[in-house]
């Protein structure tokens, strides 16, 4: 029986979901997507994603792949899935994939963004950003440069026994618009809670609660101090996956 391989880009508002990955008794993005996929194909089809985003984290560029004996042109597949999915999950793009493509293991790098509002939050934006209340962004900009390069990020994760705490950050910078400050992180991979702990430390730097020297020592492994402030998940967005 012939199998067909599909790759798609998924965007979602993570507010109402208990993260991306399936969990018992929890409503997640993966569970919701696979439910729509089963309704369409009448098959139990496992899907594989590039990133397992946390509860409340959003995506504009999550990448998935799956295989099935069900055939439909990707454009028609995309249209039908979007009809079956809730409005806070959208298939942005869908194509055929090669049999050796893997959404997670074929990924070369990822971009995440963390969004601060310059003004107090309102009813229409409070799910997607946090208020930049009395933060010194000149200090945060200096600290971002320390993050670039290959480091042991043990101080910035809840994990205790991964194979390797080393990650390479190609770019870490601040982007400013008329209404927002956006922290951009482009790296070859990220540990559990790594970006949120980094952002939490940057917030502490911006409030003069953590020095640049202390932050750099944490990145260099010259201290036993670990990050303690976990930034809220709602302002974090998975922007893009590179292959």
From Swiss-Prot:
Catalytic activity, as annotated: uridine(38/39/40) in tRNA = pseudouridine(38/39/40) in tRNA
Keyword terms of this UniProt record: Isomerase, tRNA processing
Coiled coil: none
Record-linked Gene3D superfamilies: Pseudouridine synthase I, catalytic domain, C-terminal subdomain, Pseudouridine synthase I, catalytic domain, N-terminal subdomain
A GO molecular-function annotation: RNA binding
Superkingdom of the source species: Bacteria
CDD domains attached to this UniProt entry: PseudoU_synth_EcTruA (cd02570)
Binding site for substrate: 112
SUPFAM superfamilies according to UniProt: Pseudouridine synthase (SSF55120)
One protein family per Pfam: PseudoU_synth_1
The enzyme's E.C. designation: 5.4.99.12
InterPro entries (alphabetical): PsdUridine_synth_cat_dom_sf, PsdUridine_synth_TruA, PsdUridine_synth_TruA_a/b_dom, PsdUridine_synth_TruA_C, TruA/RsuA/RluB/E/F_N
Active site location: 54
A GO biological-process term: tRNA pseudouridine synthesis
Subunit structure: Homodimer.
Known function: Formation of pseudouridine at positions 38, 39 and 40 in the anticodon stem and loop of transfer RNAs.
Entries under NCBIfam families matching the protein: hisT_truA
Family: Belongs to the tRNA pseudouridine synthase TruA family.
Protein name: tRNA pseudouridine synthase A
Provenance organism: Onion yellows phytoplasma (strain OY-M)
Name of the coding gene: truA
């Amino acid at each position: 029986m012939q199998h067909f391989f599909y790759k798609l880009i998924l965007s979602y508002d993570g507010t109402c979901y208990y993260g991306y990955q399936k969990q018992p008794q929890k409503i997640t993005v993966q569970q919701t997507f696979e439910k729509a996929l089963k309704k369409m194909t009448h098959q139990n089809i496992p899907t594989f994603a590039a990133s397992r985003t946390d509860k409340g984290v959003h995506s504009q560029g999550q990448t998935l792949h799956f295989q099935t004996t069900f055939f439909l042109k990707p454009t028609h597949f995309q249209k039908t899935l979007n009809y079956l999915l809730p409005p806070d999950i959208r298939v942005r793009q869908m194509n055929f994939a090669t049999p050796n493509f893997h959404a997670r293991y074929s990924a070369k790098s990822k971009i995440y963004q963390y969004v601060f509002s310059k003004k107090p939050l309102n009813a229409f934006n409070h799910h997607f950003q946090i208020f930049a209340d009395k933060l010194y962004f000149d200090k945060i900009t200096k600290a971002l440069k320390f993050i670039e390069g290959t480091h042991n990020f043990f101080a910035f994760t809840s994990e205790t026994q991964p194979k390797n705490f080393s990650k390479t950050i190609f770019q870490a910078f601040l982007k400013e618009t008329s209404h927002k400050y956006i922290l951009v992180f482009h790296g070859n991979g990220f540990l559990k809670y790594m970006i949120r702990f980094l952002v939490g430390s940057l917030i502490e730097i911006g409030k003069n609660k953590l020095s640049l020297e202390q932050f750099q020592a944490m990145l260099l492994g010259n201290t036993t101090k670990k990050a303690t402030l976990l930034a809220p998940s709602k302002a974090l967005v998975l922007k893009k996956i590179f292959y």
